[in-house]
Amino acid sequence: PAWREAYVDRAARMVLRDRNHPCVLFWSLGNESGFGENHRAMAEAVRSLDGTRPLHYCEAGEDPLVDIVSRMYPEVEDLKREGARTDDGRPFFLCEYAHAMGNGPGNLKEYWDAISQSPRLLGGCVWEWADHGLLAERRDGKFGYAYGGDFGDAPNDGNFCIDGLCWPDRTPHPGLLELKKVYQPVLVEAVDLRKGLVRITNRYAFRNLDETFYATYRVTTEGLRALQRDLELPKGFGPGQTREVELEYPLPIAG
């Protein structure tokens, strides 16, 4: 209780600062900060200042206080089970997933295949955007990114701050390129390639594909372009729709 006013003050200042920004979708009560009466006081203050946006807080679990249920790092199968639940009408949000450290992130396509199949699943936030290294000169005169322990600091978290989708200078890691592919607003799937049939899904919420894109397709044989043609997209290809289209091409010699 001694910290109640500090909790409430921080939440109130956040809402007053940002509530007129249309890009703010919902409010969070914090990150990995336990759960108790001070958080309930924060929620009351937030709702008194902005009753138009929902509230999430991972540490609250499924407590009635929150409008959005959230978790960190569930396995894909657990996420599918959450998406299939009918006993809780609140949406489900991955406030952290796909830790991008080292050889991560992983299972991006699998996560988003699950998310796309359930209206209950909102999506999620990859931890995290950028590595937190500082450009420093090494003993050999070359430059590299320094992190915990490189400054004589103790204790430290070592390279645990090097876990982003891009380098500190914002050069993309491979994981960011994979995430871009997963996020693409147009999905193309093979139906029967010997007959040239593919399935196209418009993932946009407001755009017709035929009014947005000029489409082409390319056939390659052993990495070399064998054919490239224009593709006329179906008329009125609206948001959320899926259409099958036929591509005209001869089968490559390689089969």
Q: What are the language-model segments listed below?
A:
Residues 1-199, 203-211, 216-224:
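Extended substrate-binding grooves/exosites of carbohydrate-active enzymes
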Residues 213-254:
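Intrinsically disordered, low-complexity Pro/Gly/Ser/Thr-rich segments with frequent PxxP/GP/PP motifs
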